């Protein structure tokens, strides 16, 4: 009976009992064979519940098959039974066991062949990525399969949506699996618009490439024939290598994985970018006092992804910080779970935890008891590998059950231990038999309910046993999906055995609700009426029972009359004969729409906004609307216990007398958790493929069909007021998604997607585009079949409570969808009418621009720049705007364009995409995307100016990138471009301009006006032309400035300027030089700012001054522009600097530059040290560092310090040139002691530690777990010197991070001075000197040597001060106020100065002159008066 319930359902059991044991034999399979098989599996320590599914049977067969050759007859019989059961589960028709074994063998052979075929297909490329495989062609050559548009599309979306948050890195890593450098560059180029991020990335790549070149020097001599050259850093980055070379390196033997190396560099750069965009440390992530544990875990893992550490370190961080930074309530529970708890167990345990701390203690105790047993509130399905521990009731040993126990039978009850009754008659509630091979969720065995939220969190297949009756009303809107039966409590979860109290013949009994049992069987009891004997099959074989008919049973408040069997059953069972009468069913989660759990933001409470007064007609309208909504179950009335409120009001519908209810959810929206938008953009008709049959549907009352989370409903409360407070106000809350609430769109979209998924899988030929409640359904079926499918879809939606009203069901073209008009072979935007007005307000212009932007996607040539100019500045919406002549002209042109209706066509995947761009002038561009000429898919415009100064080539590349990105989003691939620029012009700009970004494949098209560079800067100085040295200076306070030039022919000029800046004066100087020079000119500036602007060759600018410079440049025949560093004593530059600095700059020339340069050549000091020691401006000191070829590669070392106490040192061994360097770092200051040691032994390390302790106060040393540090010699040395030794974990902020960083810096300095020393040990000591005394920065701007002395001195002073304070507190003070002759006190002495003392009398702190205070020592007795004792102590 129980086995039948758990293994085979009724229909399958009939099939089982028809199968013969042997071919043409008489005996057939019976229920007892399943019972026997389950017992045998227990004997072999295999989970018997695997028999319940085909997959489980397949797993058992896999375990048994290897043992068949040597196994016993019993094992073979078990294999045969399980094989037959597998065929029954899989609905494979077999007549006997032999046929079943043949079918199994046939299936195994097929799967083997498939595996072999897959292996053959994959070949050696099994390790190659599936995204971008390098495959072998028919000729045996390794060829590259280009990156897919789908992958590019995914990458662009990730960057646009995540905006360089931590998730970008794992996403990039996944999408770029196995990519070549060319693929990686394509990925980077598609997001080239993010210029700041890309510049950071470029810098990282350059640094890593330089490091690669340093570590992999080029081998001298020619390359041997047939050998490949070794890749340089720039080859790995794909800039100087071809695709074939990259493939060659990656497939060579041995391979050089250039793709993986480049990917690693990019990820390093992305880490930096992520750090910039989300600078949160994992240490800052702490759980709020009331924050749900699940939300805390989400934040924790999001930040963890951004941490720059290896996976091992991240695992350690998770183990340590996740529990450590939880709030006290959760931390108590997590510690009780033990160190080996999984994340799922943690989430389960902390579900709903919060409130008083005693609640957490109670839960912790409960959890510690639960964790001691084998089952921890988790379904068996979650941990498939766990074996059930079988324990004998008789002897108590593990491994067998009482029936098979060989020990003598134990007297008394196995359940409670008392004599006089057996276990089946036991009334003790303590422990229950392990019936039907199910684990109890709680050891106490009491039936407890878990909330549906917990069930969903813990169980992958949420099952609930629900009991209902037809007379019960619906408890929640949106849950009644059956039509005939409405749900009501109780809902009994299957988290544990569903045991309920039932009333039978006036007696109360606990019984198990068993939907798998046919009959109701109860343990021995007296029932009224006649009975007849019967035999039934049970777990332990057959049992004899008494059958009573027409017995009244009450279950959960529902009555039923039926047959009851009474006999020796180990547990009372209510079977299907009674459960069906009371309407009990087993429910899986696919019935009603599952509510999405919603929370408020951590630490926030619901809205409490007062309802404002409403007019009588509005109140009447709201009452009428709410009454109707309440009848439909969308809202329900609430009492005064709900403290939350949101204001409600009513407006009249457009062109109607009907009213519409609006709720102002702004306050609730601020307090509600954030949601991830499922859809970030709307689908575009140009991306639709042409379909034979099309239908457009609209979901009616979309939001009101989806239930709102029960726990969140209280926050949606609103109130309808009454006139003059006649009656109490009516209060409601929402049961469904409200209009205007921030969560409604995301929850509706995700619910709708889940509901449509099964229909899409069943009907792959149907294309469904879903955006909110609009559905576009297309297919290539004949119209009749298509309409049948549409009806199926409507019925499918109706099952889930979504209606598709006929009024909005569009069957015939043109279809109105998402603001578009769709025809069978073309599309357009819905008709656009531009208003005719005499006066335009700001709001009118905004609406007009919106309409024109919408029209521009199919009407080519639309312009809005002049209209947008009218909206500049902060203006009120109702302010009247006067149209300029340019704006009127632009509007008239747009009206002309819109007169003729224009249509777009649909996408054909078999044809290429082509995009053509034209220049319209005034920084505006228009483009068309098509597959066939004159049949546009879509059109558009671009008019964005990314910088203040730009030129047409730069704008053209920006327009191209916009079109490419748009194409990837709509069609998943980039088009071929036709651009109005000649190749020569493009190449001239591309080669010179450092910030030039990638554009896809393109060709020149002669569509005037052509894009051209209006002037060209020369690459070399112009011989014979006059050279102008230009400079400018401005005073920040007075805003006065000068600009001027000095020429190599003795000419000079200076002009005075007012209200200016340094940057403006530098540009003004260049303008002067261009004005006063001939057709050819050389200009030398020391301004990087001016150089950067002019080298980009702008032809338009928002700056009037730059526009004037552009005019002058266009007039010239040749211009050469050069930059020199300022204050370097360069002839003309120094003269003009003196000229413009007079009376403007406070500091002129500095004598210390030469000395600083000499010092830097010897010690390679950083710029802070030089600025401090030689009194140089930072810009000059930085320039000296930048011009040093040994310092410019890596830039500045950061001197961030860990906040540690003064006595802590970190020690570590590092290796260089095959020798060992032992490094000690004073953590608080960064001061280094280092030595080359002959061997990494305990003896050498101990000697070094004793030397260190003899020089500096060492209290604690922190080391790794190296054998030299853990040796007894080092321990003995530390014990003798009184040093505490600690061992750390790598990268723990209080562990080895500081010394690891210092090792790197020390090696860098050694590299800079290595050529100055013959031996490494000399170079090490030189590097230590430079680091400790020639590098400044970090805390206080000191060098490390200055900092350690300062820290130790401060520590000594602080300790001495503390001693004095402690000493002072042993005194009492009696004092007199100015007018009062009486002595007051005693008071506490806080400080004793020369002329006064600071005292504390009660809570008041006072300053009293010394002459009016008597200070006495506290001897523990009361002392008062101006006596000799007090006098003697006066001067103490």
Curated annotation (Swiss-Prot):
Integrase catalytic domain ranges (all copies): 1202-1352
Ranges for region Interaction with Gp41: 7-31
Key word DNA-binding present: yes
Site (Essential for RT p66/p51 heterodimerization): 989, 1002
Modification Phosphotyrosine occurs at: 132
Catalytic residues (positions): 514
Region spans: Interaction with human PPIA/CYPA and NUP153: 189-227
Keywords: Activation of host caspases by virus, AIDS, Aspartyl protease, Capsid protein, DNA integration, DNA recombination, DNA-binding, DNA-directed DNA polymerase, Endonuclease, Eukaryotic host gene expression shutoff by virus, Eukaryotic host translation shutoff by virus, Host cell membrane, Host cytoplasm, Host endosome, Host gene expression shutoff by virus, Host membrane, Host nucleus, Host-virus interaction, Hydrolase, Lipid-binding, Lipoprotein, Magnesium, Membrane, Metal-binding, Modulation of host cell apoptosis by virus, Multifunctional enzyme, Myristate, Nuclease, Nucleotidyltransferase, Phosphoprotein, Protease, Repeat, RNA-binding, RNA-directed DNA polymerase, Transferase, Viral genome integration, Viral nucleoprotein, Viral penetration into host nucleus, Viral release from host cell, Virion, Virion maturation, Virus entry into host cell, Zinc, Zinc-finger
Domain Reverse transcriptase: 632-822
PROSITE patterns in the record: ASP_PROT_RETROV, ASP_PROTEASE, INTEGRASE, INTEGRASE_DBD, RNASE_H_1, RT_POL, ZF_CCHC, ZF_INTEGRASE
Residue positions binding Zn(2+): 1160, 1164, 1188, 1191
Residue span of region Dimerization/Multimerization of capsid protein p24: 277-363
Lipid attachment site numbers (N-myristoyl glycine): 2
Motif residue range(s): Nuclear localization signal: 26-32
Region (RT 'primer grip'): 815-823
Known regulation of activity: Protease: The viral protease is inhibited by many synthetic protease inhibitors (PIs), such as amprenavir, atazanavir, indinavir, loprinavir, nelfinavir, ritonavir and saquinavir. Use of protease inhibitors in tritherapy regimens permit more ambitious therapeutic strategies. Reverse transcriptase/ribonuclease H: RT can be inhibited either by nucleoside RT inhibitors (NRTIs) or by non nucleoside RT inhibitors (NNRTIs).
A GO term from the CC aspect: host cell nucleus
Residue spans crossing the bilayer: none
Region called Disordered, residue ranges: 106-128, 446-465
Domain Peptidase A2: start-end pairs: 509-578
Motif (Tryptophan repeat motif): 986-1002
InterPro entries (UniProt xref): Aspartic_peptidase_AS (IPR001969), DNA/RNA_pol_sf (IPR043502), Gag_p24_C (IPR045345), Integrase-like_N (IPR017856), Integrase_C_dom_sf_retrovir (IPR036862), Integrase_C_retrovir (IPR001037), Integrase_cat-core (IPR001584), Integrase_Zn-bd_dom_N (IPR003308)
Stretches annotated zinc finger (Integrase-type): 1151-1192
Note: HIV-1 lineages are divided in three main groups, M (for Major), O (for Outlier), and N (for New, or Non-M, Non-O). The vast majority of strains found worldwide belong to the group M. Group O seems to be endemic to and largely confined to Cameroon and neighboring countries in West Central Africa, where these viruses represent a small minority of HIV-1 strains. The group N is represented by a limited number of isolates from Cameroonian persons. The group M is further subdivided in 9 clades or subtypes (A to D, F to H, J and K). Resistance to inhibitors associated with mutations are observed both in viral protease and in reverse transcriptase. Most of the time, single mutations confer only a modest reduction in drug susceptibility. Combination of several mutations is usually required to develop a high-level drug resistance. These mutations are predominantly found in clade B viruses and not in other genotypes. They are listed in the clade B representative isolate HXB2 (AC P04585).
Protein name as it appears in the record: Gag-Pol polyprotein
Annotated source species: Human immunodeficiency virus type 1 group M subtype B (isolate RF/HAT3)
Lineage: Viruses, Riboviria, Pararnavirae, Artverviricota, Revtraviricetes
């Amino acid at each position: 009976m129980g086995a039948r319930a758990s293994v085979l359902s009724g229909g399958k059991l009939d099939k089982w009992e028809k199968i013969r044991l042997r071919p043409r034999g008489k005996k057939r399979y019976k229920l007892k064979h399943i019972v026997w098989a389950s017992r045998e599996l227990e004997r072999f320590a295999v989970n018997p519940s695997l028999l319940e599914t085909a997959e489980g049977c397949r797993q058992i067969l896999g375990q048994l098959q290897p043992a068949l050759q040597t196994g016993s007859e019993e094992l073979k019989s078990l294999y045969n039974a399980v094989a037959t059961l597998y065929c029954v589960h899989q609905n494979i028709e077999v007549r006997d066991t032999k046929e079943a074994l043949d079918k199994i063998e046939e299936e195994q052979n097929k799967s083997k062949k498939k595996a072999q075929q897959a292996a053959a297909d994959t070949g050696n490329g099994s390790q190659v990525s599936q995204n971008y495989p390098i495959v072998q062609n028919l000729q045996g050559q390794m060829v590259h399969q280009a990156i897919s548009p789908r992958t590019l599309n995914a990458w662009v979306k990730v960057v646009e949506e995540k905006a360089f948050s931590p998730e970008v890195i794992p996403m990039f890593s996944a999408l770029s699996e196995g990519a070549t450098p060319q693929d990686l560059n394509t990925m980077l180029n598609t997001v080239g618009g993010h210029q700041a991020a890309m510049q950071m990335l470029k810098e990282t790549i350059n640094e890593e490439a330089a490091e690669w070149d340093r570590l992999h020097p080029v081998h001298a001599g020619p390359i041997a024939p047939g050998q490949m050259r070794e890749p340089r850093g720039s080859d790995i980055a794909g800039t100087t290598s071809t695709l074939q070379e990259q493939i060659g390196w990656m497939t060579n033997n041995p391979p050089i994985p250039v793709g993986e190396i480049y990917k690693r560099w990019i990820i390093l750069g992305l880490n930096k970018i992520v750090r910039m965009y989300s600078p949160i440390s994992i240490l800052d992530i702490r759980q709020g006092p009331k924050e749900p544990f699940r939300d805390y875990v989400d934040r924790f893992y999001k930040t963890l992804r951004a941490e720059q550490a290896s996976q091992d370190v991240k695992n350690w961080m998770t183990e340590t910080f996740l529990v450590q930074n939880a709030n006290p309530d959760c931390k108590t529970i997590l510690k009780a779970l033990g160190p080996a708890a999984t994340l799922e167990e943690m989430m389960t345990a902390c579900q709903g935890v919060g409130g008083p701390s005693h609640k957490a203690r109670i839960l912790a105790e409960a959890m510690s008891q639960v964790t001691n047993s084998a089952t921890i509130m988790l379904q068996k399905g979650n941990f498939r590998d766990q074996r059930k521990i079988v324990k004998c009731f008789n002897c108590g040993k593990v491994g067998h059950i009482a029936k098979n126990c060989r020990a003598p039978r134990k007297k008394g009850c196995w359940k409670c231990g008392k004599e006089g009754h057996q276990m089946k008659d036991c009334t003790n509630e303590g422990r229950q038999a392990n019936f039907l091979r199910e684990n109890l969720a709680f050891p106490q065995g009491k039936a407890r309910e878990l909330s549906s939220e917990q069930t969903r969190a813990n169980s992958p297949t949420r099952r609930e046993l629900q009991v209902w009756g037809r007379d019960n009303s619906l408890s929640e809107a949106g849950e009644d999906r059956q039509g005939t039966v409405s749900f009501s409590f109780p809902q009994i979860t299957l988290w544990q055995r569903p045991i309920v109290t039932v009333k039978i013949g006036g007696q109360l009994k606990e019984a198990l609700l068993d939907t798998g049992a046919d009959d109701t069987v109860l343990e021995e009891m007296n029932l009224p009426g006649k009975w007849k004997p019967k035999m039934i099959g049970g777990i332990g074989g057959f049992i004899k029972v008494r059958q009573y008919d027409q017995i009244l049973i009450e279950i959960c408040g529902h009555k039923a009359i039926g047959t009851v069997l009474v006999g020796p059953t180990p547990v009372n069972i209510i079977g299907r004969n009674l459960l069906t009468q009371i309407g009990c069913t087993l429910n899986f989660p696919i019935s009603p729409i599952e509510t999405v759990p919603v929370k408020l933001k951590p630490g926030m409470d619901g809205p409490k906004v007062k309802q404002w007064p409403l007019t009588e007609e509005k109140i009447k309208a709201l009452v009428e609307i709410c009454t109707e909504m309440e009848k439909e179950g969308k809202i329900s009335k609430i009492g005064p216990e709900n403290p939350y409120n949101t204001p409600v009001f009513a407006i009249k519908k457009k062109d109607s007398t009907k009213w519409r209810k609006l709720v102002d959810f702004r306050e609730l929206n601020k307090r509600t958790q954030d949601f991830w938008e499922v859809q970030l953009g709307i689908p575009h008709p140009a991306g639709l493929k042409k379909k034979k049959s099309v239908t457009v549907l609209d979901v009616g009352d979309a939001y009101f069909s989806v239930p709102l989370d029960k726990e969140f409903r209280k926050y949606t409360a609103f109130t309808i007021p009454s006139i003059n407070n006649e009656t109490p106000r009516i209060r409601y809350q929402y049961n469904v998604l409200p209009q205007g609430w921030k969560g409604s769109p995301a929850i509706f979209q995700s619910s709708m997607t889940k509901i449509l998924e099964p229909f899409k899988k069943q009907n792959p030929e149907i294309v469904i585009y879903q955006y909110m409640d609009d559905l576009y359904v297309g297919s290539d079926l004949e119209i009749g079949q298509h309409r049948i499918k549409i009806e199926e879809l409507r019925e499918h939606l109706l099952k889930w409570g979504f209606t598709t009203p006929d009024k909005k069901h569009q069957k015939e073209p043109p279809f109105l969808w998402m603001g578009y008009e769709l025809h069978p072979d073309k599309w357009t935007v819905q008709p656009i009418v531009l208003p005719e007005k005499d006066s335009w307000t700001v709001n009118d212009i905004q609406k007009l621009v919106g309409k024109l932007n919408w029209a521009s996607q199919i009407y080519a040539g639309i312009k809005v720049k002049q209209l947008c100019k009218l909206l500049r500045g902060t203006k009120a919406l109702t302010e009247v705007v006067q149209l300029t002549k340019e704006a009127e002209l632009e509007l008239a042109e747009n009206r002309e364009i819109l007169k003729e209706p224009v249509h777009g066509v649909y996408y054909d995947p078999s044809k290429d995409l082509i995009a053509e761009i034209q220049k319209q002038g005034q920084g505006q561009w228009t483009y068309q995307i098509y597959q066939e000429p004159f049949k546009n898919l879509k059109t558009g415009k671009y008019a964005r100016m990314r910088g203040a100064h730009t030129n047409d080539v730069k704008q053209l590349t920006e327009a191209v990138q916009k079109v490419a990105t748009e194409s990837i989003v709509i069609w998943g691939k980039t088009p071929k471009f036709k651009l109005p620029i000649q190749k020569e012009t493009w190449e001239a700009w591309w080669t010179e301009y450092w910030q030039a970004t990638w554009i896809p494949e393109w060709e020149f098209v002669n569509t005037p006006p052509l894009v051209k560079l209006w002037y060209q800067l020369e690459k070399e100085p112009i011989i014979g032309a006059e050279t102008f040295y230009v400079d400018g200076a401005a005073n920040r306070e007075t805003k006065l400035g000068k600009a001027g030039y000095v020429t190599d022919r003795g000419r000079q000029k200076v002009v005075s300027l007012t209200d200016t800046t340094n940057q403006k004066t530098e540009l003004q100087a260049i303008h002067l030089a261009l004005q006063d020079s001939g057709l050819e000119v050389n200009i030398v500036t020391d301004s990087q700012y001016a150089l950067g602007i002019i080298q980009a060759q702008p032809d338009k600018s928002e700056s009037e001054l730059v526009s004037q410079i552009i005019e002058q440049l266009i007039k010239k025949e040749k211009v050469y522009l050069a930059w020199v560093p300022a204050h370097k004593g360069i002839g003309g530059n120094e003269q003009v600097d003196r000229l413009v600095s007079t009376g403007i700059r406070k500091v002129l020339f500095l004598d210390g530059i030469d000395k600083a340069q000499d010092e830097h050549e010897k010690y390679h000091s950083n710029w802070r040290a030089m600025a401090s020691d030689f009194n140089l401006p930072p810009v000059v000191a930085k320039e000296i560092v930048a011009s040093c070829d040994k310092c410019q590669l890596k830039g500045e070392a950061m001197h961030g310090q860990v906040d540690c106490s003064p006595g802590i040192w970190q020690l570590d061994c590092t290796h260089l040139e095959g020798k060992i360097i032992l490094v000690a770092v004073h953590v608080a200051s960064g001061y280094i002691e280092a030595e080359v040691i002959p061997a990494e032994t305990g003896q050498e390390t101990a000697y070094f530690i004793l030397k260190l302790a003899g020089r500096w106060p060492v209290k604690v040393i922190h080391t790794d777990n190296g054998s030299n540090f853990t040796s007894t010699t080092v321990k003995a040395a530390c014990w003798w010197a009184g040093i505490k030794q600690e061992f750390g974990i790598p990268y723990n902020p209080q562990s080895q991070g500081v010394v690891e960083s210092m090792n790197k810096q020390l090696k860098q300095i050694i590299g800079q001075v290595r050529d100055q020393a013959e031996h490494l040990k000399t170079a090490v000591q030189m590097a230590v000197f430079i680091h400790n005394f020639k590098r400044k920065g970090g805390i206080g701007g000191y060098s490390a040597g200055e900092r350690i002395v300062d820290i130790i001195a401060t520590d000594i002073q602080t300790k001495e001060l503390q001693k004095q304070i402690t000493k002072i507190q042993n005194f009492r003070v009696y004092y007199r106020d100015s007018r009062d002759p009486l002595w007051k006190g005693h008071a506490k002495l806080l400080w004793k100065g020369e002329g006064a003392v600071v005292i504390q009398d009660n809570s008041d702190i006072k300053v009293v002159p010394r002459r009016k205070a008597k200070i006495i020592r506290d001897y523990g007795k009361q002392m008062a008066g101006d006596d000799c004792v007090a006098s003697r102590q006066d001067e103490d």
